[in-house]
């Protein structure tokens, strides 16, 4: 890739899998890496970016934009990912574009009736349907996944088929995040770093999981 064309950095730390990728402005993935974060996102993310630069022969001075997954996901991972994306964008004077990790994962499934299942603490799960707010449900809903559903980070708490589809979605996450991010960038729709916040996989205030009857609407919490 010509350095004059610039390149796009893609980061996602919403799940236990850290995703780092580089792409071209026309949507081709140059290189990517995905690995288990082991709850060490703050120690693992920047070294992964450095490895990406070295493998692909890229330079930060040629960076054109940063695309970052915004969740829903775990508190620590998301904060590290967004802080890194914002810092790089600010220091290099390039736009930052937030993309819902859930939307990118569901996009890999081609839309349709697929639902995404994510952990929300030790006893509850979030279920996400494209275009709708996530719902918080009890873990006793395990086994209700359909043939189209995806499950992430729910080993032992979701069907093996849904977990396998989730692993496949994670494999395709770099391409999906890049595609969705570039669509926003092409429309001139970028984020103000001061207003870009993650979506945490926690119950909404005032509606603890123990009081949820089958599922409660969940909203972004900018804490």
Give the label of every model feature segment:
Residues 44-47, 79, 83, 87, ...:
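Short amphipathic alpha-helical face segments that pack within enzyme cores
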Residues 67-96, 101:
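DPxDG-like acidic metal-binding loop motif
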Residues 1-29, 40-44, 97-223:
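Oxyanion-binding and handling regions
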Residues 37-54:
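N-terminal phosphate-binding loop and adjacent alpha-helix
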Residues 49-65:
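Phosphate/pyrophosphate-binding loops at sites that engage ATP/ADP/AMP, CoA/4′-phosphopantetheine
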């Amino acid at each position: 890739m010509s350095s004059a064309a610039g390149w796009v950095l893609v980061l996602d730390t919403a799940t236990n899998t850290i995703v780092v990728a580089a792409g071209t402005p026309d949507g081709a993935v140059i290189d990517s890496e995905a690995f288990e974060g082991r709850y060490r996102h703050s120690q693992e993310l920047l070294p992964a970016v450095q490895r990406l630069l070295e493998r692909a022969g890229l330079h930060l001075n040629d960076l054109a934009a940063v695309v970052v997954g915004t969740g829903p996901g775990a508190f620590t991972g998301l904060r590290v990912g967004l802080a890194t994306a914002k810092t790089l964008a600010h220091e290099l004077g390039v736009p930052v574009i937030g993309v819902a990790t859930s939307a990118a994962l569901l996009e890999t499934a081609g839309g349709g009736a697929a639902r995404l299942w994510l952990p929300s603490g030790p006893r509850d799960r979030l279920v996400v349907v494209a275009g709708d707010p996530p719902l918080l449900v009890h873990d006793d809903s395990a086994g209700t996944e359909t043939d189209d559903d995806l499950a992430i980070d729910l080993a032992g708490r979701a069907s093996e088929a849904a977990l396998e589809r989730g692993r496949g979605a994670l494999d395709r996450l770099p391409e999906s995040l890049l595609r969705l991010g570039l669509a926003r960038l092409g429309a001139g729709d970028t984020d103000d770093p001061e207003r870009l916040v993650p979506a945490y996989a926690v119950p909404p205030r005032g509606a603890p999981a123990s009081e949820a009857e089958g599922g409660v609407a969940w909203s972004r919490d900018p804490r």
